[in-house]
Amino acid sequence: VFFAVTTQLVLGYALAQAFMRDFPGKAIFRTIHTLPLIMAPIIVGSVWKLMTTPSIGIIPSFLSGWLGYDLNIGQSAMQAFVVTVIMDVWHWTPLVTLTMIAALISLPQDPFEQAQIDGAGRWQIFWHITLPMIRPAILATLFIRLMDAMRTVDEVLMLTGGGPGSATRFVGVHIFKEVFPRTNYGYGSAISVIVLYLTIVACWLMYVGLIAPRNREKD
């Protein structure tokens, strides 16, 4: 979960910076990039299931034909985990990209112009100006994605069913399998309450890191 969310933040920011520049076909690429975001999770899981099925999937055919690598997420725990992470990154990176674009557009240009006049490099501008100014957007996006990733169920069930073994049995999938197939309602409810408490803690951390500093500045 943390690896997927971190990857989404890095890719989302990089793509946001790319889309802030003008290049041929920019509108088309932005539209294509945003398409996964409007797809329901169960559809995403079904599409990736078809693409990764060894007999008919385009991804196993490409890897086997061009790289000599056999992909079978039904038998390899590592492959199933990696493909699940890639699917989640593909599905939710557009959300991070749109958030970062909105944050970058809202930044005032005066600090950047002054930094360039003073001879600051790109990395210096990023670390000392851009990153602190978009920190609220990064924190908000981080916690939203972490909370959402903790309850991911449908797309993982469609892709791997939580297997092989327990390789992709994430928190949401674990609760689902305990409650419905096994009717272990007490255990499932207990895990759900723990997830709820973790979500509350995440919201509190977001408040401390995002809202509280602004209130102190106003005071």
Question: For the regions a protein language model found, what residue spans apply to each?
Answer:
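A structural signal for multi-pass alpha-helical bundles of membrane permease subunits
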Residues: 1-219
